[in-house]
């Protein structure tokens, strides 16, 4: 496995005003009219981050799985300084430099990227999954643990049931039941994937647990990378 060190990029937004301007600029480049790769084919990659705010350190992990078997194909981590303060709606600016570095360190193309967070299900319709997709050109989806500020009806009890995730009358994602009777996850399009396909990918990635295998493995790996960084320090 490769671990890389990350520097905050020159010109990276340092203020909320500048970050929102970047979101406005990049949001117009989100592609919503592609279905995306078929579920269960090719590769699928989970990305996640872990923070040590006291030491101003963030660790990111990218774990590539075979989409058909869910076996690990490759993995990489990156460790760097936190690149932006904690501001709801702007969390991508804290995460993207290290996530990009982890993706770039992979020895193979990642295929579909699954983010632990949001894409269009975001107050400005440009969450981490959309931001990462636009910057990389990769198909991306967001699978979140909570509905953020949006509303939804509870899906039916069986696995595979869904209900719209709504901002008023606008559907920004779906609540997807991945285990019978267990709290749903919240799926949204990031870039170059349709919402129905994003939900199908999510179900293909959750054969045994509520959260996708991509998220589970990336979460464990980024936490280990953060512990290792603390040990080395």
Curated annotation (Swiss-Prot):
Enzyme Commission no: 3.1.21.7
Record flagged with keyword DNA damage: yes
Biological processes per GO annotation: DNA repair
InterPro entries on file: Endonuclease-V (IPR007581)
Keyword entries, A-Z: Cytoplasm, DNA damage, DNA repair, Endonuclease, Hydrolase, Magnesium, Metal-binding, Nuclease
Pfam name, any one: Endonuclease_5
Amino acids binding Mg(2+): 48, 116
Residues the UniProt record annotates as site (Interaction with target DNA): 86
GO cellular component, one term: cytoplasm
Cofactor: Mg(2+)
Reaction equations catalysed: Endonucleolytic cleavage at apurinic or apyrimidinic sites to products with a 5'-phosphate
Gene Ontology molecular function: any one: single-stranded RNA binding
Cell compartment(s), UniProt: Cytoplasm
Purpose of the protein: DNA repair enzyme involved in the repair of deaminated bases. Selectively cleaves double-stranded DNA at the second phosphodiester bond 3' to a deoxyinosine leaving behind the intact lesion on the nicked DNA.
Family: Belongs to the endonuclease V family.
Name of the protein: Endonuclease V
Gene name of the encoded protein: nfi
